[in-house]
């Protein structure tokens, strides 16, 4: 049988607060000073319509930490033997589980798993394995870890199709063979003949897909990696060409919606190899994680930063994670998508500085932290995965963005976003800041100016997280970086009059809202526009993660511009974010906040109000609902905590 592994198939406020905030505006961005205007709360506001899956996983911020078999299977081009799987789990439990890497996940090379349940669901990773999924889920649980599974619920194994006794779960009248079209094999045009693609138009198809997802959930699997989605949608690979029959956009969206529904709040859905057509709308609506670059492959600097730099309208849109994270950063953030930069193979890099850059990038972008080195490969490189201060950024939910220079998409203008300078705000108001040198030859100095780039006119206390050293109060984070080197800092601004400011330019954007800087007078590097009426099925919104010590009615300020004819109203919704299903309830609202009209779009004012926040982590969403009027640009929100 031809080995069609996933890797071989791929070729390669207060008045005082307001006065302070406006007083800090630089002369180059002078704005008309406007006195604070009270917000007018109306408790009858309907909820916002969402474009995203908005699961407990994405609302929590950054991706999970786990280990994957890829470091064994890619070099061997073979499924991992069960004894090697066990040895790596034991190594993981002894060395990394205490650092939060608590999932062991399979990967490709899956065609050799042909033993199925009576409903056609595979019972183990490979036929050569003695033990089934349940055994390994229990083995991991005994070590306070969990089982992650790589499999696509749209696959139907040939062995199940050819067994007339196999029927669809809950549909004994439908045989597994009835779910496929003869010859519609995954990778058919390049030799695939073991896995069929499911025909989602067939009776029983929905039950099969959702039964597959629930089958894994019942085994205690919290994380499902679903691969080769582009090949299902249109049957094409950007490097290979036609690989199998296309199944169409409508069927693709339908299949993803079934998976989303079945996964619910109990399973994290990782979408791998999607084309991300229509700006990733289908993936946003139905997934938690989405792959944004080519496979880790042999690892090393070339896979991290080299290879193709330009965009293509097919998976992978960008080849390396620096560009992929940057290009898709408008889709990241709480309640939106977790961008997945694929696996980390520290042992494949040429220097410790490159290894730190690998880790810094994944953490800054909010990616999952997926170790793919094995116990035999790791050598003396485990340290890069276990820096507690760096990992704390991930634990706090850091999802950074590159510095934006304009609203032009990165796919159209690679100069519109800076791949080497990243920042993201944490719920307590502190920041994670990362600087990179992607040059192969030049030592360069990289800087983020806190006032100009982040809107922090007061500066902040800077701590170097690899040096474990406080650098003191400063107006910037800066580092002289050798080729391939990087630095990552935690920046803690002082609280002024008890307030904490959250810039919209570093929040999560949805429903058509996005970055802009085409009007002067804003604080920081820009603002969010698009908070206006639209023709789509989702409302534009901005979401901020906010940490408070106790439940309280919290004075709030919203710096905005509004030159429409109407007094603009925009919903403010406060939600409690917690990775527990029962804790998804609304804390306050939705309520309306009034944004009175101003002279021009270059005039900025602050609307004042009060919202209730709960103790712990809250998600505060400002959105333009269907019953609202007018439009605003939003610069920041400020909370008196």
Curated annotation (Swiss-Prot):
Biased composition (Low complexity): 561-576
Signal peptide as annotated in the record: 1-39
UniProt-annotated catalytic positions: 227, 288
Subcellular location, principal: secreted
Catalysed reactions, as listed in the record: Hydrolysis of (1->6)-alpha-D-glucosidic linkages in polysaccharides, to remove successive isomaltose units from the non-reducing ends of the chains
Top EC class of this enzyme: hydrolase
EC number: 3.2.1.94
Any one of the GO BP annotations: carbohydrate metabolic process
Subcellular location: Secreted
Keywords associated with the record: Glycosidase, Hydrolase, Secreted, Signal
A Pfam family it matches: Melibiase_C
Limits of the CBM6 domain: 500-640
Post-translational modification as stated in the protein's UniProt record: Predicted to be exported by the Tat system. The position of the signal peptide cleavage has been experimentally proven.
GO molecular-function term, one example from the UniProt record: carbohydrate binding
Listed PANTHER family: ALPHA-GALACTOSIDASE MEL1, ALPHA-GALACTOSIDASE/ALPHA-N-ACETYLGALACTOSAMINIDASE
Name of the molecule in the record: Isomalto-dextranase
